[in-house]
């Protein structure tokens, strides 16, 4: 229907898939530590008790602070953030310290996080002219990774390479990169309409409701549109 259309892979979905793989590394680490968490230490020697306690603290970090691996808010990982006492860790730590220890205890997780940061840097700093060169370097870095969950992501990037490069095309009208943000927003709005109504049995009524909600020129809004006086609604 549109032979000249450029198909683009939205960065949100690509990073989401990479985050899933990073989380698999975290879960694998937790499973390896679970035996120490459940160990009976009644008759154990001092060395075994010390090791088990250390492993339990590591398990606690990966279980409690898993969200730190995926946050995009630099305020959380600010090294100057106030440190607070943690009963389990028995010391004063901020989120930057905790993230540091999570990566320190598992070199594979650290490697996965470094590649995730490289992917985010790629999307922030590359452009259409350099995207092909940059993505080839990124694919090579992923392929050289020793972490199985992460190295296989190179195949995903290779398969969608053209679509990823197309996502750096900037539209002249708005000066924005091509993405599926508008479509995702419309789909979410329609799902909310269906959810709030507990479903529709009449197609025409459902269609009219969707068109009314998505139409910017509707005469009534729950919140006044920007630049309009409330009395004009």
For every predicted segment, state its role.
Residues 14-38:
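Short alpha-helix plus adjacent loop in nuclease-associated cores
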Residues 1-6, 12-15, 35-233:
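Acidic/histidine-rich catalytic cores and adjacent linkers
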């Amino acid at each position: 229907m549109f032979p000249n259309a450029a198909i683009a892979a939205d960065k949100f979905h690509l990073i989401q898939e990479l985050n899933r793989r990073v989380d698999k590394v975290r879960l694998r680490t937790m499973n390896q530590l679970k035996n120490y968490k459940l160990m009976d230490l009644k008759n154990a020697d001092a060395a075994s008790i010390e090791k088990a306690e250390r492993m339990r603290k590591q398990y606690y970090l990966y279980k409690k602070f898993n969200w730190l691996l995926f946050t995009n808010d630099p305020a959380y990982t600010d090294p100057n953030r106030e440190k607070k006492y943690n009963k389990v860790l028995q010391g004063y730590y901020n989120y930057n310290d905790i993230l540091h220890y999570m990566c320190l205890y598992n070199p594979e997780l650290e490697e996965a996080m470094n590649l995730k940061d490289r992917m985010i840097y790629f999307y922030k700093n590359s452009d259409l002219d350099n995207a092909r060169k940059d993505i080839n370097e990124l694919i090579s870095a992923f392929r050289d990774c020793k972490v199985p969950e992460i190295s296989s992501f190179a195949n995903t990037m290779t398969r969608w390479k053209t679509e990823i490069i197309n996502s750096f095309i900037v539209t002249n009208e708005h000066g924005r990169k091509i993405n599926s943000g508008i479509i995702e927003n419309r789909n979410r709005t329609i799902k909310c309409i269906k959810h709030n109504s507990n479903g529709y049995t009449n197609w025409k009524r459902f269609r009219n409701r969707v068109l009314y909600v998505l139409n910017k020129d509707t005469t009534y809004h729950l919140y006044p549109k920007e630049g309009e006086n409330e009395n004009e609604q």
